[in-house]
Swiss-Prot record:
Its main location: other. Pfam families: SspH. The keyword Nucleotidyltransferase does not apply. One of its GO terms (cellular component) is endospore-forming forespore. This is Small, acid-soluble spore protein H. HAMAP family: SspH (MF_00667). It comes from the Bacteria. InterPro entries: SASP_SspH.
């Protein structure tokens, strides 16, 4: 995935399924300069990780 698509997903009112390493995640934010997104595991929203947007996959 790229930064542009992550930003589109963040601004969308629709639910768009995204995975990171096969795990469903919610995208919380995206840093356009570094290409890093903050994501939460859907099943464990208490923990967030910062990942490169290229590691995210839209399902």
């Amino acid at each position: 995935m790229d930064v542009k698509r992550v930003k589109q997903i963040l601004s969308s009112s629709s639910r768009i399924d995204v995975t990171y390493e096969g795990v469903p995640v919610w995208i919380e934010s995206c840093d356009e300069q570094s290409g890093v997104a903050q994501v939460y595991d859907v099943s464990n929203p208490g923990e967030s990780v910062h990942v490169n947007v290229t590691a995210l996959e839209e399902k």
